[in-house]
Amino acid sequence: MSKLELSIDVLEKNLGKILNQDQLYSLLDHSDWLKKWEKKYKIVYYLRLRGYLFPLKRNLFLVTSPEKKWTEDQILSLYYWEVLAKMGKDLWWNKWYIWGLKALEIRLWDYDIRDEILLVNGEAQGVELVMLDKIAQLKSYNNKKKKSLISDFLKYWDRVEIGGKKFLLAKPELAILEMLYNSSALLKSYSDELIKKRMKKNKKNFDFELIEWVLKLGKHNSSVNKLMDLVMTFDQEMAEKLKTLIKRFWYLLY
């Protein structure tokens, strides 16, 4: 058998797996000929050209076959949540979770894959590619001494299972505050309606103590003010409770 045929034989035993470059090299290293071959990247390149590896992003591949003609929507539907879980574990182990709009959508049984997802972690700010053209907006919270607050925020989460993978999901109150802080102009109307829907449905369980805790940290005062204004349109009693918390622990913006 040729070198390429030997590597294809190895891959065919791992169809459907997602491998990063190191894992792929390690897998191919089980072939004696590859242990002596220094330029492994060349065989990876040829395997990609022949349809045995589908690139999800730089140095991350789906093991597939030339007969399988994937569309990007199919790939996303089957593998997005697996790739997201793998990315989070590789970067931050278990100190991260889903926040903002997607966290609230998931609570309303909406698992559609958005162009971007917000992830709170203890280290990074910025943007990370998840796969294909889908990105993660990264956010970290620090105190005045620049110390990470991730351990404090990780007290307020729920565990959910999506696509066979477990994720930590921000409490709805935290998700709402981040939505009000970070919502784009294009999504504002949609986000506001989603917040109203959640709060009307779960009025009795709304956690005012969690809002108080956030204000005491010196975080999200503007979001709590926006929430008060939004709630005022459908529930004045709840709005007054929020107003009292703002005046007690921070300040009104008007």
What feature does the model see in each segment?
Residues 127-128, 133-168:
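Glycine- and acidic-residue-rich phosphate-binding/metal-coordinating active-site segment common to enzymes
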